[in-house]
Amino acid sequence: MDGEKVKLRLENISQSFITNNRVFDAAVDVSLDVKDNEFLVILGPGRCGKTVLLNMIAGIEKPVDGRILLDGEEINGSDERIGMVFQKRALMPWKTVMENVEFGLKLKGVPKDERRAVAQKYIDLVGLQGFEKSYPDALSGGMKQRVSIARAYTNNPEILLMDEPFGALDAQTRYAMEEEVQRIWQTEKRTVIFVTNNIEEAVYLADRIVLLTNCPAKVKAVYDVNLPRPRDTVDPEFLRLRKEISENTDLAL
């Protein structure tokens, strides 16, 4: 992906917290370029600081050192150009699928007919047509995550952050959602930064994989994934890359 536009740049960012009167380093001197329309996966062992990095990009937390640039301009705090999908599906249980998906546009004052048309487009895109009037309690885990993805896309983000969005799903549903998010990304072509601790998931989805060390998070290696889509998980090159990354991944202690 050399020569492609840099959409997001992390320059020497670090994060630390005070815990029990001691300084806890969560991320140290992380630098990273994310290309426009790239599907970038941040991979690392559990509790290594992946989510901390994502929270800094989202503006939920401010780095103690370094800076974050979006289209060459430093960002501080939340930015409407960045959307986020969490592992825990933050849906409003008292609102229908349509009301959840259109909620961000409603807050922006978008007229009802216009926001409903946009929301319907993404409800259809994630395969939930016919469930517009359903409430979250009536949906499966995978369907709830589809609602979260549709809601994020409805707000028209330039960058979509996904924090282990399929971690709580069973294996079969997780695989189906991996296929689905790849299809949606190929249709919409937004920049996606996807966090996971699952090596096979990373190789299946990514254009590039950024492997982090155990906590505090540092960039340990970067892998280009030059495999055709849709990917075959038993392809020899897929298996070779998965093995190489596995052997280079720190254990979570």
Describe every region a protein language model picked out.
Residues 58:
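Helix-to-loop junction immediately C-terminal to a conserved catalytic motif
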Residues 66-78:
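Conserved ABC transporter NBD signature motif
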Residues 106, 113-131:
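Conserved ABC ATPase "signature" region
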Residues 135-139, 143:
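Conserved ABC ATPase signature
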Residues 154-158:
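A short, proline-enriched helix->beta-strand linker immediately N-terminal to the Walker B motif
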Residues 160-163:
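Catalytic Walker B motif of ABC-type/P-loop ATPase nucleotide-binding domains
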